[in-house]
C-alpha cells in the first residue's frame, strides 16, 4: 500500500510518477523498496488519470449496512421449504439420545485444545 501512497504523493506534488521519483519517496519514508513492485506500479499507472480515478472513487456510493438483503420472491419460497424440512428433521430426531453422546464427544476435543 505504501507504493500507492507514494504515487499519490507524487501526483499531489505535480511530480512525474516514474521509477526514480517513486523510489525516492519510498526511501524517504523508510520503506524497503522492491524494484519489481516499483516497475509494476509505474507500468500500471502509465495510462491512468489519477485525479479522475480518485474523484470516481470518492463519488462511489457506499452501501448502507442495514443487514442482509431480502431474498427474491422465488428464493423466499425455497428458503421457507428448507426451514420446514429442517424443523421436521429436528422433530423426528427428538427421541434419539445417540446425538447427545456424539455432541459431547466432539466437544471433548475442543476442551483439550483450549483446556
Swiss-Prot record:
Q: Where is this region: Disordered?
A: 56-115
Q: What is this protein called?
A: Large ribosomal subunit protein P1
Q: Might you name a Gene Ontology BP term for this protein?
A: translational elongation
GO CC: one term?
ribosome
- The gene for this chain is rpl12
Q: Name one Pfam family in it.
A: Ribosomal_60s
Q: Gene3D superfamilies attached here?
A: 1.10.10.1410
Under the heading NCBIfam families, the entry gives: ribo_P1_arch
What organism does the record attribute this protein to? Haloarcula marismortui (strain ATCC 43049 / DSM 3752 / JCM 8966 / VKM B-1809)
Q: Which family does it belong to?
A: Belongs to the eukaryotic ribosomal protein P1/P2 family.
Amino acid at each position: 500500500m505504501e507504493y500507492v501512497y507514494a504515487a499519490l504523493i507524487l501526483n499531489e506534488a505535480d511530480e512525474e510518477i516514474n521509477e526514480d521519483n517513486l523510489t525516492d519517496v519510498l526511501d524517504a519514508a523508510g520503506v524497503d523498496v522492491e524494484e519489481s513492485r516499483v516497475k509494476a506500479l509505474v507500468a500500471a499507472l502509465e495510462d491512468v488519470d489519477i485525479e479522475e480515478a480518485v474523484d470516481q472513487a470518492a463519488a462511489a456510493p457506499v452501501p448502507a449496512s442495514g443487514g442482509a438483503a431480502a431474498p427474491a420472491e422465488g428464493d423466499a419460497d425455497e428458503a421457507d421449504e428448507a426451514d420446514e424440512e429442517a424443523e421436521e428433521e429436528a422433530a423426528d430426531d427428538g427421541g434419539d439420545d445417540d446425538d447427545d453422546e456424539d455432541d459431547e464427544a466432539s466437544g471433548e476435543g475442543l476442551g483439550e485444545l483450549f483446556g
